[in-house]
């Protein structure tokens, strides 16, 4: 077993703080509209330029094992905030550093770390309560554009793009970010239910110019069976022919004489039809087919339900305004399902979303939810160079997360003002002893740090700016981009309440851990064994 290094008391805490400071000092130069960028070296390919706190923090590993522990703890603050709220990672890191430094002064002076921790927790609870009171709901497209622009480093173009996408797909819709081949960033909207399966035969095309099959007002047969014998679908084909409407078959596969029959009938003009493979795999396929059935008001014909294909009647088929398919994907537009059934299905998927721990499952459930609720928007990111493309894509993803957070819990004044306005509320925190009061004071002293830093990064004296803002009321604050004092809501300088809340909670959690740490145990680095030189050749 490898030998361990042990460090105790003050020595341990000092090493932790050194590591924490290295990460925080690298990250904090990016805060605010006048924050700088950091260039990250990559082993392969071009370096990455970013001003995203969590991306920078993740790249830092230190040689000293004790210092590295401190660095890893700050990374945890940034990652956790990023996971929960999608933004605010730099603010969280800066707050953690401020809380630790303030707390350390008192712990060294003899305060009991456990009581100090309790005081910090009580103060944070009060601040979170106050933030909820300050927050106002996101009501307009303009609000969304402001939140997204601030998160994307004051890029109004990105802000407007995300606001447009949100407006089109609604708050349950999915917005995906992809890389574009061109240099412009565009927004594409996918209407209705789209899945990645195309037509099974090119003979089914109705629009040769666009290589698409477009069927108006079709009947839709939805099954997870493989159809190869024509006798299985002959009864339903005859019934659909009598209505004069086209037929779409979504099945595990359609092959052999069944497919040949559909093609021949199409070519002869007897029945316009389209056969498509079912999307997904395994249980997910069944769930997606069930979604399609509910969306179109049809019945999912499965082996488990015991309905034979021969016995399918017209009322078991789904209906839609239009189905469009090319060789890669199929889109069902204007499904004619019962609204209540669709809403119940959406509620069911939302419940599953809350209960799942898997990131992959969450993503897939989110996609299914969007397809039922209103569609998918795709933002195609364009840029002149690979490095710029990566950086821009990253900013858009950040802005998207921040926007979703804003829709959930509302917005608060940005630029560090919201935290500053909660300081007065700390007067009401009830404490049991002097050390708990010290914990509350530590939080009080740390709440103006983000605002000071934003001003410092803009080349101003942070302490003076913070004092001026403290003298003002409500949403009044400092606009660092234009060097003026404004109403933050009116100027569009806003943060999602969820981002500010998560940043403080995660920072306080890690700070409390550092302050109550008395010992560190780390692996002793192994010395590299020197290999003897090869024997000389004779």
UniProtKB/Swiss-Prot annotation:
Alphabetized UniProt keyword annotations: ATP-binding, Chaperone, Cytoplasm, Isomerase, Nucleotide-binding
Organism: Dictyoglomus thermophilum (strain ATCC 35947 / DSM 3960 / H-6-12)
Gene: groEL
GO MF terms held by the record: ATP binding; ATP-dependent protein folding chaperone; isomerase activity; unfolded protein binding
Family statement: Belongs to the chaperonin (HSP60) family.
Enzyme class: isomerase
Domain of life, per lineage: Bacteria
Binding-site residues, ATP: 30-33, 87-91, 415, 479-481, 495
E.C. code: 5.6.1.7
Annotated function: Together with its co-chaperonin GroES, plays an essential role in assisting protein folding. The GroEL-GroES system forms a nano-cage that allows encapsulation of the non-native substrate proteins and provides a physical environment optimized to promote and accelerate protein folding.
Locations listed in the record: Cytoplasm
SUPFAM superfamilies documented for this protein: GroEL apical domain-like, GroEL equatorial domain-like, GroEL-intermediate domain like
Keyword Isomerase in annotation: yes
Catalysed reaction equations from the record: ATP + H2O + a folded polypeptide = ADP + phosphate + an unfolded polypeptide
This protein's name: Chaperonin GroEL
Pfam families: Cpn60_TCP1
Subunit structure: Forms a cylinder of 14 subunits composed of two heptameric rings stacked back-to-back. Interacts with the co-chaperonin GroES.
Biological process annotations from GO: protein refolding
Keyword Transcription belongs to the record: no
């Amino acid at each position: 077993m490898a030998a361990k290094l042990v460090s105790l008391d003050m020595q341990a805490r000092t090493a932790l703080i050194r590591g924490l400071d290295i990460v925080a000092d690298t990250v904090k130069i990016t805060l605010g509209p006048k924050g700088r960028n950091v260039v990250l070296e990559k082993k392969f390919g071009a370096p990455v330029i970013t001003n995203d706190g969590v991306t920078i923090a993740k790249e830092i590993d230190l040689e000293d094992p004790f210092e590295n522990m401190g660095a890893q703890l700050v990374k945890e603050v940034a990652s956790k905030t990023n996971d929960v709220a999608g933004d605010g990672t730099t603010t969280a890191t800066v707050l953690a550093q401020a809380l630790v430094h303030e707390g350390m002064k008192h712990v060294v002076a003899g305060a009991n770390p456990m009581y100090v921790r309790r005081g910090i927790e009580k103060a944070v609870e009060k601040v979170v309560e106050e933030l909820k009171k300050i927050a106002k709901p996101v009501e307009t497209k303009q609000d969304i554009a402001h939140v997204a622009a601030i998160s994307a480093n004051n890029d109004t173009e990105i802000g407007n793009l995300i606001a447009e996408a949100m407006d089109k797909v609604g708050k349950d819709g999915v917005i995906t970010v992809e890389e574009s081949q061109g240099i412009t960033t565009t927004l594409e909207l996918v209407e209705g239910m789209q899945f990645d399966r195309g037509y099974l035969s090119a003979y089914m095309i109705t629009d040769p110019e666009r290589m698409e099959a477009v069927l108006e007002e079709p009947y839709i047969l939805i099954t997870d069976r493989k159809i190869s014998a024509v006798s299985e679908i002959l009864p339903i084909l005859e019934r659909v022919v009598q209505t004069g409407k086209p037929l779409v078959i979504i099945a595990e596969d359609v092959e052999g004489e069944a497919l040949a029959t559909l093609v021949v009938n199409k070519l002869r003009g007897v029945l316009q039809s389209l056969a498509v493979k079912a999307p997904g795999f395994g249980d997910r396929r069944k769930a997606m087919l069930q979604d399609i059935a509910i969306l179109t008001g049809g019945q999912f014909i499965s082996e488990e339900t015991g309905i034979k294909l021969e016995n399918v009647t017209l009322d078991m088929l789904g209906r839609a305004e239009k189905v469009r398919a090319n060789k890669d994907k199929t889109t069902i537009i204007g499904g004619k399902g019962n609204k209540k059934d669709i809403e119940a299905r959406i509620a069911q998927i939302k419940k599953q979303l809350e209960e799942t721990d898997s990131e992959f499952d969450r993503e897939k459930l989110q996609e299914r939810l969007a397809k039922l609720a209103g569609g998918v928007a795709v933002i195609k990111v364009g840029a002149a160079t690979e490095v710029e493309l990566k950086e821009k894509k990253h900013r858009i993803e950040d802005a998207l997360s921040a926007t979703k957070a804003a829709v959930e819990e509302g917005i608060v004044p940005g630029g560090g003002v919201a935290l500053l306005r909660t300081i007065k509320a700390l007067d009401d925190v009830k404490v049991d002893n002097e050390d708990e009061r010290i914990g509350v004071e530590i939080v009080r002293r740390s709440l103006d740090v983000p605002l000071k830093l934003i001003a410092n990064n803009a080349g101003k004296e942070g302490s003076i700016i913070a004092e001026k803002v403290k003298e003002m009321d409500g949403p009044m604050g400092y606009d660092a981009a234009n060097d003026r004092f404004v109403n933050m809501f009116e100027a569009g300088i806003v943060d999602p309440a969820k981002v500010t809340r998560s940043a403080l909670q995660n920072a306080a959690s890690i700070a409390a851990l550092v302050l109550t740490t008395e010992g560190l145990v780390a692996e002793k680095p192994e010395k590299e064994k020197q290999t003897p030189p090869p024997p000389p050749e004779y």
